[in-house]
């Protein structure tokens, strides 16, 4: 059985005849969020039968939802082969102008999606790394995270959302399926999520950053840097042995960036590890000449971790050092702490519950 969400509109046009039926199917999948082919009444009976026979829109399903006090929602998905992965919906307030020029408060949504079941990178601070790598998600398994979260939260197809490939897994390690998912999500007759609203967060596979840049898709780039010297970064991210800081920075310098955008450098701040002024000074020098923004992230403690959450005063001082010298720097607002929103934590929680139940 084939996953219907694996295909672009053009690919479905080649599979369905006449081709205009593919556009109708896309409307049902991505505008009506319909998963049962038999309910797609403007498709012929013959096409509905073919779709039911050869394809499925329900190979992946949501098996758990947790809601945070701050409005964040975390979902656990289960694949056809019994594997689980996660996605998170973040709801934030924003101020914008209405048609009469008045400033009004609204809401914006960001969906944090997974690209793999588990991860190969093995970051020492990451909860997902504890479970190792299982397999890549297909393009359809990536796409379905957005479809499901929009449907479950009654978000209209035209409601703009931002997508960050920052959940379980290293997106650039699943390159072909990632690119296919981006193309499906940005399809004008589908969800129509502009590539400018899609951010790929990578631990820094330098050759894949170059390859992504060569495609010039218009996506945004975020680098999980977390350290400013190779010795510490290798301790935190073992993959740094293969792709050191210099190679990553060089690849970023060649990456095509929209004139109104910046490369995001994510910096997970860990108490007593990388929260000092010397690190801030080195980071400033490292990013010199790059149109960039630094996003400071509080380390989110989890069971068994050797690291601790930094002091707020240290975060503020780090930010001030950078901003005082002209580097745009923000402190990420913590979301979903009460529901263990860090990637991999809900999956691990469910596995533990199941193991306890089987004793």
Swiss-Prot record:
Cofactor requirements of the protein: [4Fe-4S] cluster
Domain named Radical SAM core: residues: 105-338
Species of provenance: Wolinella succinogenes (strain ATCC 29543 / DSM 1740 / CCUG 13145 / JCM 31913 / LMG 7466 / NCTC 11488 / FDC 602W)
Extra information: Reaction proceeds by a ping-pong mechanism involving intermediate methylation of a conserved cysteine residue.
InterPro entries, per the entry: Aldolase_TIM (IPR013785), Elp3/MiaA/NifB-like_rSAM (IPR006638), Methyltransferase_A (IPR040072), RlmN_N (IPR048641), RNA_MTrfase_RlmN (IPR027492), rRNA_lsu_MTrfase_RlmN/Cfr (IPR004383), rSAM (IPR007197)
Stored HAMAP family: RNA_methyltr_RlmN (MF_01849)
Active site: 86, 343
UniProt cofactor note: Binds 1 [4Fe-4S] cluster. The cluster is coordinated with 3 cysteines and an exchangeable S-adenosyl-L-methionine.
Chief location: cytoplasm
Reactions accelerated catalytically: adenosine(2503) in 23S rRNA + 2 reduced [2Fe-2S]-[ferredoxin] + 2 S-adenosyl-L-methionine = 2-methyladenosine(2503) in 23S rRNA + 5'-deoxyadenosine + L-methionine + 2 oxidized [2Fe-2S]-[ferredoxin] + S-adenosyl-L-homocysteine; adenosine(37) in tRNA + 2 reduced [2Fe-2S]-[ferredoxin] + 2 S-adenosyl-L-methionine = 2-methyladenosine(37) in tRNA + 5'-deoxyadenosine + L-methionine + 2 oxidized [2Fe-2S]-[ferredoxin] + S-adenosyl-L-homocysteine
Any one GO MF annotation of this record: tRNA (adenine(37)-C2)-methyltransferase activity
Key word tRNA processing present: yes
Gene Ontology annotations for the cellular component aspect, listed alphabetically: cytoplasm
Record-given protein name: Dual-specificity RNA methyltransferase RlmN
Subcellular location: Cytoplasm
